From Swiss-Prot:
Keywords: Acetylation. The modification N6-acetyllysine is found at residue 80. The keyword Acetylation applies. It comes from the Bacteria. Belongs to the UPF0502 family. This is UPF0502 protein YceH. The keyword Acetylation applies. Pfam families: DUF480.
């Protein structure tokens, strides 16, 4: 696939896509901002602990591949990065806000059920109902320039199948899945995580505001 990424590249792009929507006042992101976003404890699976040098290497690679671009100049004391992975002026990949929300959540969290995706993507896009989630996933799975997601085989006893993005290559549909919580508990956990993410982002905004006032 034209857009095939490594796991670390997927994390970096997912973070930039997320912050572009959820904290636009802090976007584009500096190197430090990207490191912080990549290593977040909430809304990340797996949790990573990348160094500045490791993140810088990924940023440089993505700039060379034209998936990111640097932003510098008047008023910018440090180099910042913005994504050109999708919906950029000269890029080919065009996604709707709903598609961006689902792709971003899959890049950051891996395989998830439609119910989990709806809860976890709510900060980026508010789906009207589960039918909209399902139809958006179906479109991503059937796009002519894709497919970009795949529906995984449902495990025995599970109510919903999980979906996974294909930006890191084909997914082994027969691979054994990690143990999952029951559907109701899983949905509750997703809602708790969404609230934790909101609190974390509010704290991040407050810290940024206090730092700005202190300058």
């Amino acid at each position: 696939m034209k857009y095939e990424l490594t796991a670390r590249e997927a994390r970096v792009i997912g973070c930039l896509l997320e912050k572009q929507v959820t904290t636009p006042e802090q976007y584009p992101l500096s190197l430090n901002g990207v490191v912080t976003a990549c290593n977040q404890k909430t809304n990340r699976e797996p949790v990573m602990n990348l160094s500045e040098q490791e993140v810088q290497t990924e940023l440089d690679n993505l700039v060379k591949r034209h998936f990111l671009r640097t932003v510098s100049g008047f008023g910018n004391r440090v180099t910042k990065y913005e994504q050109r992975f999708c919906n950029s002026e000269f890029g080919d990949l065009k996604l709707s806000p709903a598609e961006v929300a689902l792709i971003t959540t899959l890049l950051l969290r891996g395989a998830q059920t439609p119910g989990e995706l709806r809860s976890r993507a709510a900060r980026m896009y508010e789906f009207s109902d589960m039918s909209e989630v399902d139809s958006t996933l179906e479109k991503l799975a059937q796009r002519e320039d894709g497919p970009f997601v795949v529906r995984l085989a449902r495990e025995p006893g599970k109510r919903e199948s999980r979906y996974m993005h294909l930006f890191c290559g084909e997914v082994d549909d027969t691979a054994s899945f990690a143990e999952e919580t029951p559907p109701v508990a899983g949905e509750l956990q997703a809602r708790v995580e969404a609230l934790e993410n909101e609190v974390a982002e509010l704290k991040q905004r407050l810290d940024s505001l206090l730092a700005h006032l202190g300058d």
